[in-house]
Amino acid sequence: MSNLHAFYTKILSLLHELEPMDNFFNQTRVPKASDKTLIGRIERSVYNRRRRQLGVKIEQFRQQIVNQLSPSSLCYLIDSMPLETCKISRAKRSRICQETEQTSPDYGYCAAHNMIYFGYKIHAVCTQQGIFKTFDISKASVHDIHYLDDVKNQLNHCILIGDKGYLSRQYQRDLFDSAAIELTTPKRTSQVDFEPFKPLYRKARKRIETLFSQLCDQFNIRRNYAKSFTGFATRILSKITALTMIQWINLRNGNHINNLKIVVA
């Protein structure tokens, strides 16, 4: 337990630097544990409920950390990753995240794994250093390219590197005209103006693929037992925030920010 308490104390001290306030709800009574100090004080169900309520605040914390890690960048990477809620054989009788039609899971296809799955898809933009700038969750059936409509309102004056799923001259023109974003993707060999993808861009794209692998292997982002969409989305947010927090601790300790398997205290 000594290591756990050491990690907890370190993370709590960093949170106090970002936000001196301890509680974020207007309560008539003084709570036994603040919204930050949760370890060993409350039951899991209470913790999950409080975490769902603090989803907006968690994202604010994450954005503050991102701004300290990478205030601005001239190059970003964009990609998506499938998130299953259940196996295909159980999809028709599954009741997970089925509160509303707008947020219910759907069937989708993942070209990288050559599989049809049932669930959601996470769209993410990260820097060349491997820091998640923005992300969103959509139904699995939503095409990757539609996330670019959100990106143009979040980024500007930069290069955006994606895979063939983002190949579209119309979106390229729209991004450049509206936000001065230069979208760069590999071209299909059947295109008239085909030219090989630059090795520099191909190498840069490996960073976001590595981040997704770390989220799967070390944070079990695909293992999610939430029953509601709010709970599902909050757990995804918490795991990405945990990764960003470790990167921030690494930066402060003089370590490589993407060396996630280290002692943080």
Q: How should these model regions be labeled?
A:
Residues 1-265:
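Short alpha-helical elements
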